[in-house]
From Swiss-Prot:
<keyword id="KW-0574">Periplasm</keyword>
<dbReference type="GO" id="GO:0042597">
    <property type="term" value="C:periplasmic space"/>
</dbReference>
<dbReference type="InterPro" id="IPR027467">
    <property type="entry name" value="MopterinOxRdtase_cofactor_BS"/>
</dbReference>
<keyword id="KW-0479">Metal-binding</keyword>
<feature type="binding site">
    <location>
        <position position="181"/>
    </location>
    <ligand>
        <name>Mo-bis(molybdopterin guanine dinucleotide)</name>
    </ligand>
</feature>
<feature type="binding site">
    <location>
        <begin position="510"/>
        <end position="511"/>
    </location>
    <ligand>
        <name>Mo-bis(molybdopterin guanine dinucleotide)</name>
    </ligand>
</feature>
<feature type="binding site">
    <location>
        <position position="484"/>
    </location>
    <ligand>
        <name>Mo-bis(molybdopterin guanine dinucleotide)</name>
    </ligand>
</feature>
<dbReference type="InterPro" id="IPR019546">
    <property type="entry name" value="TAT_signal_bac_arc"/>
</dbReference>
<keyword id="KW-0411">Iron-sulfur</keyword>
<feature type="binding site">
    <location>
        <position position="804"/>
    </location>
    <ligand>
        <name>Mo-bis(molybdopterin guanine dinucleotide)</name>
    </ligand>
</feature>
<feature type="binding site">
    <location>
        <position position="51"/>
    </location>
    <ligand>
        <name>[4Fe-4S] cluster</name>
    </ligand>
</feature>
<feature type="binding site">
    <location>
        <position position="533"/>
    </location>
    <ligand>
        <name>Mo-bis(molybdopterin guanine dinucleotide)</name>
    </ligand>
</feature>
<feature type="binding site">
    <location>
        <begin position="245"/>
        <end position="249"/>
    </location>
    <ligand>
        <name>Mo-bis(molybdopterin guanine dinucleotide)</name>
    </ligand>
</feature>
<dbReference type="GO" id="GO:0005506">
    <property type="term" value="F:iron ion binding"/>
</dbReference>
<dbReference type="InterPro" id="IPR050123">
    <property type="entry name" value="Prok_molybdopt-oxidoreductase"/>
</dbReference>
<keyword id="KW-0500">Molybdenum</keyword>
<dbReference type="GO" id="GO:0050140">
    <property type="term" value="F:nitrate reductase (cytochrome) activity"/>
</dbReference>
C-alpha cells in the first residue's frame, strides 16, 4: 500500500487530533490510513452539522452513503481536530427510524386532528397543507399563518423561507429557533454598534493575554475553540483564564480565577468593573471621546410574559428599549454605586476575585477577550448584559484589534449566517434591514421585484408569541422546519402543547426523525439532511462556508429548500395578495408564488450548465436551474457595498470559508479597525459605522431581579443547558450509539448537601417540580457539573425527560429571547 505525502500528513493530523480530544478514532471515522484506491472512498469538505464553531470536516462517501468523517487539516477553524460529536457525524443520517414518506393524521383515510399518522404521497401532503394555509389566509388574513425556522437551515433555505413568508404570504410570522439562543446578542450589537455580529475572529485565541468566560462552558459547548484557548494558556505562563458561572463545570479546570455568582448578578458585576475602571483612572479617554456616546436606558421593562401576568402588568416601561443621552460624568456617577461591596452582596463572589477580574480589564498592557454564550443571552436582561459587556471594552479601548474584544459565541451552525445575516427573524430582513423601516422595506421590494407595499411593516409573532397565538387560536396554519420546539421551548405544558393540539390549528413539521415536535403535529414531512443537499452555513466569526451535495437522501425525503419552493407552486397570486397590490403589478396576475419569487429572472439566472454533470444536486435538477446559486447571489446583493459583503458564489466552494465583509477578494478579520476593515476611512483609527455618526454607545443600565426566584416552597434555582456528547434536543446525537452510550439519560446535577437535606442520594429517583410542571429524573452529586448549594442543573437533550415542562417562558423584553437559566423548583424523593 502506497501513501502520498498528503495522505500521510492527513493520517498524522487525524491521529493527533484524536489524542488531544481524548478519544480513539472509531473505525468508521478513521479511514485515512487505508489507500483510497482500494477502499474507493471519496473525500470532500463540509462544515460540521452541529454547533456554531464552524469546524470543517472531510466527508468520506462510498456506495452512496457517508461512511466516515474526519477533521479537515486545511481548516483554519479546527485545524484537523474534531470533538467527539464531530467524529461520529457519519452516523447521524442513518438512524433506524429515519422518515421517508409524508405522514398525515387520518381516520378511515380522511384527515383527522385526533387520528393516527398514516403514509401519504407528497402531492396529497401538499394538497391538504395548501388547503389549510389558503383557508387561514381567506378567513383571517396573513397573521393567521406562520413558520418557525432554524439556525440550522442553510443560507438559501432561510432566504427562500423569508421570501415565501414575507413576500409571498405577506406575513412576518417567521422566526427561527435562534430566537432562543442569539436574539439578545443581536439586540446588544444593534443597540451598541448599530450593526450585528462580532468584530473579532478566532485569531484572537492566539493573540489574547486574558480570556474571560461569562456564562459559557466552552470546554463542552465549543470544545475545539477551547482546545485552542487551552493551547494558548498552557504554552504561555503569563496568559490567564477567568470563568464566571452560576455553577462549576469543566471550563473551571483551566481557570486561574473561577467565580460562582448568584443568578442574574452578572449585571451588578459588569457595572462594578466599569466603576473600577473609572475609579482607577483606566479609561482610555481619547478613545471614548472620539468613538463613543453615552446614553441612559429606561428601566423596569417587564419580563416578556403575557400582558395579563401580574409581573408584566406591574412594569413601568414594559418592553421599552428607549434611552436618552448623558455625559461621561453622569455615567460615572451612575455606576459609582456599584462598588465592590455591592457586587459582593449581590453576587456572592469574594471581593478579591472580583478585583482580580476588574484589574485585568483595567490594565492597559493586557489584551483581553471576553466570551459568552447562553448564560448571557438566555437572560431576562440579556440585551443589557451584552450592552454592559461592551461598556467594559469600550471604556478601555480593548476592542476591534487582535487579542482584544468582546465575542458572543454562537450555538447553532448557521444562527449567524441564516438567522441573523439572512434575516429570518420576525422583525428583520437581510443585511440588518428591518421590516418596520419603510426605507428598508423599499430596498427589499426593489431587489425582490415586488410592488411597493408588499412587505408588511409590523413585526410578526416571535417564537414565544407564536406559541401563545397558537394556543389562543390566532395563528392557525403553522410550519415547523429544522427544529424541535416542543422539546426546546419553555413552559411546554402551559404554552406549547395546547397550541399544537388546538383543533383550530394545522401543524406541519418537517424533520428527518419522529421528534417530540413531529409527533405533536398533524402532518410530518420527511427531510433531507446535511450533505444530502448542497448547503452553506455562517459561523460565529462571520465565516461563510459551502458544501456540495455528496449523497442522495433516502427515497421520499426532500430538502427544506425543495419543500419551500415546491410548495410555492400551489398558490396563485390572487390567492395571497390583495387586489390593490396586484393592480400595481398586473403582469403577475395568474402566476404562482413560484413564478414571482423564484423564477423572477434573478433566482433562475444560472442554468444547469453550471452544475457539473458528475455533481449531485437534486433541487437544481428538479427545478431546472441552479437555484442555490441564484438564491445566494440575490441575497448577497443586499449586503454588498453595505458592510455585509459576500464573495461570489463559486469562490466559497473552493475556499474553507471566508469572513465577511469580503471586499476585492479579501476577508475581514477585525471589523471597525483601520487597516483591517475596508469600510473604515483612512486616518480614523476606528469607526463603528453601524451608527450614522460612526460611534458606539455606552449604556447606563442597572441591575434588575429575575422574573422568578426561589421561595419557601420552590427553594432551588434551576438552570438548563447542554453536555458535550449531545447537541440540542438530541434528535441526531441520541441516534448515534456511541454518543448515546456515553451519556444515555439526563440527570439532575445537585450539591451533595442539598441532596442530603432532601433525603436523596446519588442515583435516586426524584421528582423535579416547578409551578408549571414536573418530571421524574435521577440525582447526580458528582461528575462534571457541580452546582453550589441552592441550584440544580439539568441538560435538555433527553426526550424522555422534558425539562422544559418546568421552565418559565419569561423573555428579555427587548430581544424576546427566553431565559432558560433561572426559575424556581423543588425536589422530592420519588416514592
Amino acid at each position: 500500500m502506497k501513501f502520498t505525502r498528503r495522505e500521510f500528513m492527513k493520517a498524522q493530523a487525524a491521529a493527533s487530533a484524536a489524542a488531544v480530544a481524548g478519544i480513539a478514532l472509531p473505525a468508521t471515522a478513521s479511514n485515512l490510513i487505508a489507500s483510497q484506491d482500494l477502499t474507493k472512498i471519496k473525500w470532500e469538505k463540509a462544515p460540521c452539522r452541529f454547533c456554531g464553531t464552524g469546524c470543517s470536516v472531510l466527508v468520506g462517501t462510498q456506495h452512496g452513503r457517508v461512511v466516515a468523517t474526519q477533521g479537515d487539516p486545511e481548516s483554519p477553524v479546527n485545524k484537523g481536530l474534531n470533538c467527539v460529536k464531530g467524529y461520529f457525524l457519519s452516523k447521524i443520517m442513518y438512524g433506524k427510524d429515519r422518515l421517508t414518506t409524508p405522514l398525515l393524521r387520518m381516520t378511515e383515510g380522511v384527515y383527522d386532528k385526533n387520528g393516527q399518522f398514516e403514509p401519504v404521497s407528497w402531492d396529497a401532503a401538499f394538497d391538504i397543507m395548501a388547503d389549510k394555509f389558503k383557508d387561514a389566509l381567506k378567513k383571517k388574513g396573513p397573521t393567521a399563518v406562520g413558520m418557525f425556522g432554524s439556525g440550522q437551515w442553510t443560507l438559501w433555505e432561510g432566504y427562500a423561507a423569508s421570501k415565501l413568508m414575507k413576500a409571498g404570504f405577506r406575513t412576518n410570522n417567521l422566526d427561527p429557533n435562534a430566537r432562543h439562543c442569539m436574539a439578545s446578542a443581536v439586540g446588544g450589537f444593534m443597540r451598541t454598534f448599530g450593526i450585528d455580529e462580532p468584530m473579532g475572529c478566532y485569531d484572537d485565541l492566539e493573540n489574547a493575554d486574558v480570556f474571560v468566560l461569562w456564562g459559557s462552558n466552552m470546554a463542552e459547548m465549543h470544545p475545539i475553540l477551547w482546545s485552542r484557548l487551552a493551547d494558548r494558556r498552557l504554552s504561555n505562563p503569563d496568559v490567564s483564564v477567568h470563568v464566571l458561572s452560576t455553577y462549576t463545570h469543566r471550563s473551571f479546570e483551566l481557570a486561574d480565577n473561577g467565580m460562582i455568582f448568584t443568578p442574574q448578578s452578572d449585571l451588578a458585576i459588569l457595572n462594578f468593573i466599569a466603576n473600577y475602571i473609572i475609579q482607577n483612572d483606566a479609561v482610555d479617554k481619547d478613545f471614548i471621546e472620539k468613538h463613543t456616546n453615552f446614553r441612559k436606558g429606561v428601566t423596569d421593562i417587564g419580563y416578556g410574559l403575557r400582558p395579563t401576568d401580574p409581573l408584566q402588568k406591574a412594569a413601568e416601561n414594559p418592553d421599552s428599549g428607549a434611552s436618552s443621552p448623558i455625559t461621561f460624568e453622569e455615567f460615572a456617577e451612575y455606576v459609582s454605586e456599584f462598588d465592590v461591596d455591592y457586587a459582593v452582596k449581590m453576587s456572592g463572589v469574594p471581593a478579591e476575585k472580583l478585583i482580580e477580574l476588574a484589574k485585568v480589564y483595567a490594565d492597559p498592557a493586557k489584551k483581553v477577550v471576553s466570551y459568552w454564550t447562553m448564560g448571557f443571552n438566555q437572560h431576562t436582561r440579556g440585551v443589557w448584559a451584552n450592552n454592559l459587556m461592551y461598556n467594559v471594552h469600550l471604556l478601555t479601548g480593548k476592542i476591534s484589534k487582535p487579542g482584544s474584544g468582546p465575542f458572543s459565541l454562537t450555538g447553532q451552525p448557521s444562527a449567524c449566517g441564516t438567522a441573523r445575516e439572512v434575516g429570518t427573524f420576525s422583525h428583520r430582513l437581510p443585511a440588518d434591514l428591518v421590516v418596520a423601516n419603510p426605507k428598508h422595506r423599499a430596498i427589499a421590494e426593489k431587489l425582490w421585484k415586488l410592488p411597493e407595499g408588499t412587505i408588511e411593516p409590523k413585526p410578526g409573532y416571535h417564537a414565544v408569541l407564536q406559541n401563545r397565538m397558537l394556543k389562543d387560536s390566532k395563528l392557525n396554519a403553522y410550519w415547523v422546519m429544522c427544529n424541535n420546539n416542543v422539546q426546546a421551548g419553555a413552559n411546554i405544558n402551559e404554552e406549547i402543547i395546547p397550541g399544537y393540539r388546538n383543533p383550530e390549528n394545522f401543524i406541519v413539521v418537517s424533520d428527518p426523525y419522529p421528534t417530540v415536535t413531529a409527533q405533536m403535529g398533524d402532518l410530518i414531512l420527511p427531510t433531507a439532511m446535511w450533505v444530502e443537499k448542497e448547503g452553506a452555513y455562517g459561523n460565529a466569526e462571520r465565516r461563510t462556508q459551502f458544501w456540495h451535495q455528496q449523497v442522495k437522501a433516502p427515497e421520499g425525503a426532500k430538502s427544506d429548500l425543495w419543500q419551500l419552493v415546491e410548495f410555492s407552486k400551489r398558490f396563485k397570486i390572487e390567492e395571497v395578495w390583495t387586489e390593490d397590490l396586484i393592480a400595481k403589478m398586473p403582469e403577475v396576475r395568474g402566476e404562482t408564488l413560484f413564478d414571482v419569487l423564484y423564477k423572477n429572472g434573478q433566482v433562475d439566472a444560472f442554468g444547469l450548465d453550471e452544475v457539473a454533470d458528475e455533481r449531485l444536486n437534486d433541487e437544481a435538477r428538479d427545478f431546472g436551474f441552479y437555484i442555490q446559486k441564484g438564491l445566494f447571489e440575490e441575497y448577497a446583493s443586499f449586503g454588498r457595498g453595505h458592510g455585509h459583503d459576500l464573495a461570489p458564489f463559486d469562490q466559497y466552494h473552493e475556499a474553507r470559508g471566508l469572513r465577511w465583509p469580503v471586499v476585492n477578494g479579501k476577508e475581514t478579520l477585525w471589523r471597525f479597525r483601520e487597516g483591517y476593515d475596508p469600510y473604515v476611512e483612512k486616518g480614523s483609527e476606528v469607526q463603528f459605522y453601524g451608527h450614522p455618526d460612526k460611534k458606539a454607545v455606552i449604556f447606563a443600565l442597572p441591575y434588575e431581579p429575575p422574573a422568578e426566584s426561589p421561595d419557601q416552597e420552590y427553594d432551588l434555582w434551576l438552570s438548563t443547558g447542554r453536555v458535550l456528547e449531545h447537541w440540542h434536543s438530541g434528535s441526531m446525537t441520541r441516534r448515534v450509539p456511541e454518543l448515546y452510550k456515553a451519556f444515555p439519560d439526563a440527570v439532575v446535577f445537585m450539591h451533595p448537601d442539598d441532596a442530603t437535606a432532601r433525603g436523596v442520594r446519588r442515583g435516586d429517583e426524584i421528582v423535579l417540580a416547578s409551578r408549571r410542571g414536573e418530571l421524574t429524573s435521577r440525582v447526580e452529586t458528582r461528575g462534571r457539573n457541580r452546582p453550589p448549594r441552592g441550584l440544580v442543573f439539568m441538560p435538555w437533550f433527553d426526550a424522555k425527560q422534558l425539562v422544559n415542562k418546568i421552565t418559565l417562558d419569561a423573555t428579555d423584553p427587548l430581544s424576546k429571547q427566553t431565559d432558560y437559566k433561572k426559575c424556581a423548583v423543588k425536589i422530592t424523593k420519588k416514592v
